[in-house]
Regions:
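Short, surface-exposed interaction loops/tails
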Residues: 194-196, 263-316
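Cytoplasmic membrane-interface regions of multi-pass membrane proteins
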Residues: 9-13, 82-100, 155-169
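Membrane-embedded alpha-helical segments of integral membrane proteins
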Residues: 110-160
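Internal/C-terminal transmembrane anchor helices
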Residues: 165-194
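Generic alpha-helical transmembrane segments
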Residues: 62-85, 142-151
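Alpha-helical transmembrane segments and their helix-start/interface "positive-inside/aromatic belt" motifs
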Residues: 12-30, 96-107
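Extracellular/periplasmic head regions of type IV pilus-like filament subunits
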Residues: 217-278
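Membrane-helix interface motif
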Residues: 32-52, 116-127
Length: 316
C-alpha cells in the first residue's frame, strides 16, 4: 500500500512539475516571439522612411525598449524550461503520451496560430491604410516566419513517435538556430536604441520644452488681455495663476530661462539643451520637433503670438 501511495504521489508531483514547465515555457515563448517580432518591425520602421508618418508605421523607441526588455527576460526562461521538458522526455520521466504534453503542446500550437493571424491582420490593415508595400512585405514575412517556425516546431514535436532515449537532430537544430536568430535580433536592436543616459538627457529636454509651452501659453493669454508682449518672465509669472516660478527655470540647473522681445508679436525663449531633436525619428517626438526645433547647447527659439489663429512657430 505504501509503495503504490508513494508512486502515485511521485507521479502527481511530476505532473505538477511538467505542467509548470510547459505553462512557463508558453508564457516565455509568447513574450520572446512577440518581442523579437516587435524589434524587427521597429528596425524596418527605422530603416525604411515613409513620407506619411503614420503612428503604426513609424519608429517608436518606447516599443523598441519594451521589446528589448521582454526579450532579455523571456529568452533564458524559455530555453531553460524547454531544456527541462526535453531532458525529461529523453530520459522517459515524461511520457510522450502524457496528457499534459499533448494538451499543452496543442495549446501552444493554438496560441501561435492566433498570433500569426493577429500579426497578419495588423500588417494588412496598415498596408490598406497607406503603408509602404516594402514595409508590408517585410513585416508580413517576419510575422509568418516567426509564427510559422513556432507552429512547425511544435507540430513536428507532437507527431514524433520515438522520443525516449533518442536524440533528435531537428529539435537540436531548431534550438540552436532559433537562439542564434534571437541573439542576432537583440544585437541588431542595440544599433538603433538610444542609451539610458541619452534617454534621460532627452527627457530633461522634454521637461524644458514643456515649460516653454507653459510660458508660451501664458504669453498668449497676456497678449490677448494687454495687447502687447510682457517685458520679462517675472511679469508673466505675476500675471498668470497657472505658471509657477519653477517653470521659469531649467529643471536640472535651476538657471532661469532667457526671454527677449524681438518685435510687436515676436519673441524668443532661450535655454540650455542636452540633446538635439532635429534628427529625431521617434513618432512621439514629432510635436516638439515641429513646435520647438532645437540643437544641442544654448538655443533661442523664436515664436510668434497670434491671438486669432493661435501660436505659430517661426521658420528659423
Amino acid at each position: 500500500m505504501s509503495y503504490w501511495r508513494t508512486k502515485y504521489m511521485n507521479q502527481s508531483n511530476n505532473n505538477a512539475k511538467f505542467a509548470f514547465f510547459y505553462m512557463l515555457s508558453l508564457v516565455a515563448l509568447i513574450f520572446m516571439a512577440l518581442s523579437a517580432g516587435m524589434i524587427v518591425f521597429q528596425i524596418i520602421n527605422k530603416l525604411i522612411k515613409d513620407i506619411i508618418e503614420q503612428y503604426s508605421g513609424s519608429f517608436n523607441s518606447g516599443s523598441l525598449k519594451f521589446a528589448i526588455s521582454a526579450l532579455i527576460i523571456s529568452t533564458p526562461i524559455y530555453y531553460f524550461t524547454a531544456r527541462q521538458i526535453y531532458k525529461n522526455l529523453y530520459t522517459g520521466a515524461l511520457s510522450k503520451d502524457s496528457g499534459i504534453r499533448k494538451w499543452l503542446t496543442y495549446f501552444i500550437l493554438f496560441v501561435s496560430s492566433v498570433v500569426m493571424i493577429g500579426w497578419l491582420i495588423g500588417t494588412i490593415n496598415t498596408f490598406l491604410d497607406g503603408d509602404l508595400t516594402l514595409k508590408f512585405a517585410l513585416k508580413s514575412l517576419t510575422a509568418v516566419a516567426i509564427a510559422g517556425a513556432v507552429f512547425g516546431f511544435y507540430f513536428y514535436d507532437i507527431k514524433r513517435e520515438e522520443i525516449a532515449g533518442k536524440k533528435d537532430m531537428i529539435i537540436k537544430t531548431f534550438f540552436w538556430s532559433s537562439l542564434i536568430i534571437i541573439l542576432a535580433i537583440f544585437i541588431g536592436s542595440l544599433f538603433i536604441v538610444e542609451s539610458p543616459k541619452e534617454t534621460r538627457l532627452r527627457k530633461i529636454d522634454e521637461v524644458v520644452l514643456n515649460r516653454f509651452n507653459s510660458i508660451d501659453n501664458a504669453i498668449n493669454m497676456y497678449f490677448a488681455d494687454m495687447e502687447k508682449l510682457p517685458k520679462n518672465l517675472d511679469t508673466i509669472s505675476d500675471y498668470s495663476n497657472h505658471l509657477s516660478k519653477d517653470e521659469l527655470a531649467d529643471p536640472e540647473t535651476d538657471k532661469k530661462f532667457d526671454y527677449n522681445v524681438l518685435s510687436e508679436k515676436k519673441y524668443e525663449l532661450c535655454g540650455d539643451f542636452r540633446t538635439s531633436n532635429l534628427d529625431q525619428e521617434d513618432i512621439r517626438a514629432e510635436y516638439f520637433k515641429e513646435r520647438w526645433p532645437h540643437d544641442t547647447g544654448y538655443q533661442c527659439l523664436m515664436q510668434l503670438v497670434n491671438v486669432r489663429e493661435g501660436l505659430e512657430r517661426l521658420d528659423r
